[in-house]
Amino acid sequence: MNASTTRRRFGQFTLVATAAALLTPLNAGVANAAEASETPTSSPAAYINYLESTSEIGADQTLKDFKALDAIHQKRYLNYLNDPDVFEDLLEEAADGSAPPNTKSLSDTGKLSTTDSATSEGGDIVLEKETNATFIPDAPLKGQLGTQALSRGTWTSHYTVSQKIFGITVTKLKAEVNYYTTGRKVTRVNWANGQVRNFNAVVAISKGIPKAWLSGGTAYGQVTWEGSIVYKGFGIQLDKVHRVWANHNGYQGGYLRNV
């Protein structure tokens, strides 16, 4: 499902750029102290050096994709990274990914993935909200009638928000919850986790301690993202709650909201 967005300004916001991924504090080797005026997003050469210097998983692909852009699009890409208004728009769009109550969102194939997207900046930027799940089944029971919403076993449901600029995944944030269902109800929540991949060099994102719980037959997983814009002109702080929930019918919802 696609929806277009327009540029908006909000009086106050807390950053999570789509929704890409773990931005560890900027690599010490990325910025040369002798070049105090240069940041990893100040020029295509500086950004390429940043990607070549980081050990983050996926950096090689991002580097390849960025190099494939022509000079004009490389400059526009970096302008978007340095523009806080872009993150305002993305935050608004990433707020909610809930399904209608008790939607049977998963099947016995053991895996299902759905993706919604919204565009901004004339299609240059795409925000994707993805839901998916994986399944480890129990051995079939004799006489099982197959009337369950889900198969008996252990499920992991995910809610992921990603930002793409010119088709390049810049930041990806994922919340996930692992739980056990008898096929008719959730009986146990095992764990929750969050994953982050980020190649926006002006944003530092860290993960809080994940939380998992069972309430009213629904499994919940939650993680808090904390961080800041490290580019001197922004002064934006990050404080977002990323939550996902599921029941015996499968994935039921997720959101990315201000704390």
Model-assigned labels for residue ranges:
Residues 136-259:
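Mature secreted bioactive peptide module from preproproteins
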Residues 6-8, 128, 151, 242:
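Short, intrinsically disordered low-complexity segments
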Residues 1-35:
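Secretory targeting and sorting signals
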Residues 19-20, 63, 161:
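Residues at structural and domain junctions
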Residues 29-151:
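N-terminal propeptides/leader regions of secreted preproproteins
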